[in-house]
Amino acid sequence: RVGIIGNSDGHKGRPGASYPGAGWFGAVGGLTCFLMPELTRESLIKCINSRHHYATTGGPSGRMLLSVSMSFDEPATQYLDDPMIAKACSTKKCLDAIMGDIVHLPVGNSNLKVSVDAASPVRCIDIFNGLEHLECYRPYAESDLGDRIGVLWEGAEYRGRFRAVSWDGSAHFNKAKISSTSAVNFFNRDKTIDSVSSSDLAWQSVTTGNSAGFITELTDSRS
């Protein structure tokens, strides 16, 4: 019964493209995708009530098309109203459902289908059942990584203002040499990652619930 919405807490009138400047603002404004058959007020309200929507972190890679659906081996009951709120709920039989639907399946198995179309490569897809982490799907093999190493950090100190976390640090490679480095989500002009030497990196980074990091390509990485 969860429908997630992502908003842009900026002051520039650019939803999904409100980047932080200097200081401790560390994330891009979020976006919400509503799955509606038509762009009308009635369709929007029905979409929200049905939880047929999802949130992204915004930015160039945050305008993904996400489809999540389930199919059932046996007929299931779909609640058209929330049974936790409405005393009398309308229902219908179904063999499939999409994100946000409330479904009761007394017998039989269900099959989950997820499709993601994004402007950047998909690193992984985590599947949860409530708080239980069921599986992490990665659309690549270890051999596809080559000589690249990715280091990521994420999170917030707590919910609310002043939740920013400082991730200032450094990395040293004992034998391998740094060929190139790409920063991941370094949005602040005063927070950078620098090559100190052929074996060392140093960076300043801040997150406020989002993720950041770097991808380094090494030479002689297997030594």
Predicted regions and their residues:
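C-terminal functional module detector
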Residues: 1-223
